[in-house]
Amino acid sequence: IVGGRAAEPHSRPYMVSLQIRGNPGSHFCGGTLIMGWGRLGTREPLPXVLQELNVTVVTAGICFGDSGGPLICNGVAQGVFSFVR
């Protein structure tokens, strides 16, 4: 995340990290990414620190670039999207 800041531990309880039991740090992906860690590609390593930032909500035009992060409204996960028009 460009211009973000490190999130406080446990401040985002709806974010998850899927790992292989007995192999800490071995993140893997399934059919859907449900964590907003800013992955740029399937072969890129995951960052160790979740980041957050404030964004301006737009009501018209095209919004894209989230790449599968969760849609959170008032602290509740409402859905997962990758591209909205």
Curated annotation (Swiss-Prot):
Its EC number is 3.4.21.-. GO terms for molecular function: serine-type endopeptidase activity. Coiled coil: none annotated. The active site is at 67 (charge relay system). It comes from the Eukaryota. GO terms for biological process: proteolysis. Pfam families: Trypsin. Keywords: Hydrolase, Protease, Serine protease. This is Neutrophil elastase 2A. It comes from Equus caballus (Horse).
